Amino acid sequence: MSKIVKVLGREIIDSRGNPTVEAEVHLEGGFVGMAAAPSGASTGSREALELRDGDKARFLGKGVLKAIEAVNGAIADALVGKDAKDQAAIDAIMIELDGTENKSKFGANAILAVSLANAKAAAASKGMPLYEHIAELNGTAGQFSMPLPMMNIINGGEHADNNVDIQEFMIQPVGAKTLKEAVRMGAEVFHNLAKVLKSKGYNTAVGDEGGFAPNLKSNAEALEVIAEAVAAAGYVLGKDVTLAMDCAASEFFDKEAGIYNMKGEGKTFTSEEFNHYLAGLVEQFPIVSIEDGLDESDWAGFAHQTQLLGDKIQLVGDDLFVTNTKILAEGIEKGIANSILIKFNQIGSLTETLAAIKMAKDAGYTAVISHRSGETEDATIADLAVGTAAGQIKTGSMSRSDRVAKYNQLIRIEEALGERAPFNGLKEVKGQA
């Protein structure tokens, strides 16, 4: 009953108004899985390729008809008749057929959409929720946990049209006892932040990931207004709510000069100086996680950052590792960072994503499941976080349906699993157990 009978691709629209790939996989017995590929704005140079048409007369060159053609043509031809339950074989067929190092022939957007749709169809054929099927694929059947959310409530960098250089300022509702309570706490802080910003005369328009995107005097001020909002919501900063940042430092690194140029603050830093700048913020605020604190190619700087901060806080590699086991293995060997951000469109298939999570966990690194800035209503990452018991999730703020869809799916899953999926809070964050 799990034999593939049809594979279908279509062009749909993401949360930024750009096209993306949606795929359907149909099985014998009428089971169907449907999934859509997300899309990033601040992308690592070593990510798998997102195939775009380049026809400027259509969607400003961002159409995905070539990727759709691959889904409806070569990929469909290769997968019809195959067993959807064998996810590793399905993904291997597509990767081999593509034949490139970075999935540039079919596009990671095409391969991923089919990969995820296949997993959903297989789960349906087994009569189980996706998270349960993912746990089985992961070799951890029946082992679940609810992830601690990192909620991006102030957006800067490539995710907003403002003067804030650091891309994401996040809160983690660590005082919550359940995922549902964590979502409530996040929403309360978010609404109080709106009031704090308005009281200071700041704009409360939101960025790509649903966080506010005001022009601020400094990056430290972003943390200060969040601290005010946490207090106004009736919570204790550092006890009930902790802070996290995604610097996305590759976006303000001047490669030629070898400096970090924070135009919003009018400051420049060497790697070492920027590491000490971050260490200063960690001293001043209860920041427990920093992502991409340096440029993706600045491995010497990352080694210094890990020595300086790695035993105190979680240091997450996103552009640094791009969900790629080859790059992660090198990072583990060299003692670079202590956590990996997991974005399945960076690598382009579910099987390879699960391999990256396993490699990280086996090495004592944490794995943070993440959305992209260009999202859809697809909430697969919620099931991925629970099904791998990854422990942490980044899926934006408390506004925009493309973000909230993931929180709502997590609430549903928690309700279904009850005590089988504990919410471990701060214990999930590297260095905070």
Swiss-Prot record:
Pathway: Carbohydrate degradation; glycolysis; pyruvate from D-glyceraldehyde 3-phosphate: step 4/5. Keywords: Cytoplasm, Glycolysis, Lyase, Magnesium, Metal-binding, Secreted. PROSITE patterns: ENOLASE. The gene is eno. SMART domains: Enolase_C, Enolase_N. The active site is at 209 (proton donor), 343 (proton acceptor). Its cofactor is Mg(2+). Gene3D superfamilies: Enolase-like C-terminal domain (3.20.20.120), Enolase-like, N-terminal domain (3.30.390.10). It comes from Vibrio vulnificus (strain YJ016). One of its GO terms (cellular component) is cell surface. This is Enolase. Catalyzes the reversible conversion of 2-phosphoglycerate (2-PG) into phosphoenolpyruvate (PEP). It is essential for the degradation of carbohydrates via glycolysis. It comes from the Bacteria. The keyword NAD does not apply.
